[in-house]
C-alpha cells in the first residue's frame, strides 16, 4: 500500500535531519495518513479511504459526495 493521500495526493518528501552541530543525514517526511471509513448518505454505504488529516478537512469542508465525484473523475476506484 503506497503512502499517498487519495484526496490531496500528498506523498512522502525527502529532506535532512540536522543536528546541533549541523551534521546532515537524509530522512523521509511521511504524510499523516489514516485509513478512514466515511458514511456516504447518497449511496447508503461506507467508503474506506486512505487520507491525510488535510484530506479529512477537505472532506469536512466540501462534503464526501463532491470529493468522491472528483476521485471518480480522476479514474480512481472507490
From Swiss-Prot:
Q: Which GO terms describe its molecular function?
A: structural constituent of ribosome
UniProt-listed Gene3D superfamilies: Ribosomal protein L28/L24
GO BP terms in the entry: translation
Write down the InterPro entries for this protein, in alphabetical order.
Ribosomal_bL28, Ribosomal_bL28/bL31-like_sf, Ribosomal_bL28_bact-type, Ribosomal_bL28_sf
Keyword annotations for this protein, in alphabetical order, are:
Ribonucleoprotein, Ribosomal protein
Entry annotated with the keyword Cytoplasm: no
**Cellular-component GO terms for this entry:** cytosolic large ribosomal subunit
Family indicated by similarity: Belongs to the bacterial ribosomal protein bL28 family.
Name this polypeptide is given = Large ribosomal subunit protein bL28
UniProt organism field: Psychrobacter sp. (strain PRwf-1)
Gene, per the UniProt record: rpmB
